[in-house]
């Protein structure tokens, strides 16, 4: 049975919206990237939502692009963890002059839900991304990428909105639409590796301590769905995906969605991101396809080891 994310996880969606918004109607200028790499500027009306009063993250301060962003990685020492029989999450954040380096054992910080035929085991993730990323002349498609596109601030790999070739009746389908993800937007793969295809800023998922919930492999930060409208981030708005469902996402998800920003308020670009008030690019995790990253706006850093591996097919 296929379950709409908007219905099945409405509680999580409302929690996501409760991270900050402008309380009064207003107008804002939203600058975004097209697939050709050109910037477009539109005026978007900011309207109040029916969501509960917004909560500002405990750490509302945001690092300047180029600073070592250790402050946005949450303290995981007191989290529940995957379960008594599993290792606790371990995440190490370091920076060189040019790179952000994150090492993780890949263990979720919340209870593991066995939704696939695969188990859950510790991994040896090491991600290296540019500390001072720049927007590329053209965007890079991720439609054929089956593997890591980034990582969360809790040390988990981020995959695209596409599952692998197994099960065959859902080959390369939308894992959110097909209902094969847990309440935090993840599941385990063939190598017993936990990864996220979607991100939800729920307290349970330990992604509420900062507006930034992850980083893409091109180095740009991934925010939750709330976007800053000024440099100090004292004014915010909820941003949404620009993709419409135009086909059946059960299989080949990229054939089932079409980008269309017409008539939408606070819509993101085709990469699911935008240029913020400080002039730098950022992605946003959204409740709708492509959920996290729609394409790379910058140049992805070549990874090594496990981080460079493609996503193997699911068992069974």
Language-model segment annotations:
Residues 1-8:
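Bacterial N-terminal signal peptides that target proteins for export
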Residues 177, 199-252:
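Short helix-loop boundary/capping segments
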Residues 137, 202-207, 289-294:
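Short loop/beta submotifs within extracellular cysteine-rich repeat domains
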Residues 23, 30-179:
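Solvent-exposed N-terminal domain segments of exported/luminal and surface proteins
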Residues 149-184, 237-271:
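Short, flexible domain-boundary/linker segments around small modular repeats
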Residues 37, 52-56, 249-316:
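Long, compositionally biased interface segments
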Residues 154-156, 190-203, 277-290:
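Extracellular/lumenal glycan-associated surfaces
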Residues 15-18:
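C-terminal motif of bacterial Sec signal peptides marking the signal peptidase cleavage site
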């Amino acid at each position: 049975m296929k379950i709409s994310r908007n219905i099945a996880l409405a509680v999580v969606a409302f929690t996501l919206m409760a991270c900050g918004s402008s309380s009064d109607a207003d107008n804002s200028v939203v600058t975004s990237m097209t697939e050709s790499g050109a910037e477009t500027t539109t005026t978007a009306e900011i309207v109040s939502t029916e969501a509960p009063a917004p909560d500002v993250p405990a750490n509302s301060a945001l690092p300047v692009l180029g600073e070592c962003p250790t402050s946005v990685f949450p303290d995981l020492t007191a989290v529940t963890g995957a379960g008594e029989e599993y290792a606790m999450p371990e995440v190490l954040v370091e920076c060189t002059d040019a790179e952000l380096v994150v090492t993780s054992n890949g263990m979720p910080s919340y209870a593991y839900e066995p939704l696939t035929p695969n188990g859950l085991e510790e991994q040896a993730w090491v991600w290296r991304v540019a500390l001072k990323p720049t927007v590329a002349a053209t965007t890079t498609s991720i439609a054929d990428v089956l593997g890591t596109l980034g990582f969360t601030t809790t040390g988990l790999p981020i995959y695209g909105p596409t599952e692998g070739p197994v099960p065959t009746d859902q080959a390369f389908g939308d894992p959110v639409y097909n209902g094969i993800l847990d309440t935090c937007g993840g599941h385990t793969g063939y190598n017993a590796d936990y990864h996220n295809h979607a991100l939800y800023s729920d307290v349970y998922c330990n992604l509420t301590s900062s507006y930034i919930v992850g980083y893409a492999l091109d180095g740009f930060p991934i925010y939750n769905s709330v976007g800053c409208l000024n440099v100090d981030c004292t004014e915010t708005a909820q941003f949404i995906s620009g993709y419409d469902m135009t086909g059946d996402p059960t299989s080949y998800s990229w054939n089932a969605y079409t980008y269309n920003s017409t008539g939408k308020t606070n819509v993101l670009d085709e990469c699911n991101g935008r240029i913020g008030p400080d002039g730098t690019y950022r992605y946003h995790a959204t409740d709708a396809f492509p959920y996290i990253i729609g394409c790379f706006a910058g140049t992805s850093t070549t990874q090594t080891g496990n981080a460079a591996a493609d996503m193997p097919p699911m068992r069974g």
